[in-house]
From Swiss-Prot:
Role, per record: Component of the SWR1 complex which mediates the ATP-dependent exchange of histone H2A for the H2A variant HZT1 leading to transcriptional regulation of selected genes by chromatin remodeling.
Annotated localization: Nucleus
Top-rank lineage group of the source organism: Eukaryota
Gene Ontology cellular component terms for the protein in this record: Swr1 complex
Family membership noted in the UniProt record: Belongs to the SWC7 family.
Organism annotation: Candida glabrata (strain ATCC 2001 / BCRC 20586 / JCM 3761 / NBRC 0622 / NRRL Y-65 / CBS 138) (Yeast)
Protein name: SWR1-complex protein 7
Entry keywords, A to Z: Activator, Chromatin regulator, Nucleus, Transcription, Transcription regulation
Keyword flag Transcription regulation: yes
Statement: the UniProt record of this protein carries the keyword Transcription regulation: yes
Length: 129
């Protein structure tokens, strides 16, 4: 899996970790501008450690554990520069991007995964009859 091929659920979790870190930084230092951090997030060793120690990321995107802080910065910058379809680039923040991937993930669940689970459950139920 290359860096640009992370699924929406993986991107969403990384963005959530990143957002939590930005909020924490602003709470510690009132001089920081949260609006600026949402467009140009601080990605440091703490963010990297949180990503690398996350069990979900370990299972679903093991390559995250091999990323450096610099690679993670590049990755997030890439996602921000890709933006969101039909949304002006200047309106893209880590929150709007997370919302986009959240919505995308919900659609994936509704359109692909839930029908598959229902079908498999029905097959199992039919076998038990």
């Amino acid at each position: 899996m290359t860096e640009s091929e992370y699924s929406s659920k993986v991107r969403l979790l990384i963005l959530q970790i990143l957002l939590q870190h930005q909020q924490s930084l602003v709470m510690k230092n009132k001089d920081l501008d949260i609006k600026k951090l949402l467009v140009e997030p601080v990605i440091d060793i703490e963010v990297m450690n949180n990503c690398q120690s996350n069990t979900f990321l370990k299972l679903n995107a093991p390559t995250v554990s091999k990323l450096t802080v610099r690679n993670l910065r590049f990755l997030v910058e890439e996602w921000l520069s890709e933006g969101i379809p039909n949304v002006p680039k200047e309106e893209t923040t880590i929150i709007t991007l997370a919302n986009y991937y959240y919505s995308k993930r919900i659609n994936e669940l509704e359109e692909k995964e839930l029908p598959t689970i229902r079908s498999e459950a029905k097959e199992l139920f039919d076998r038990l009859k």
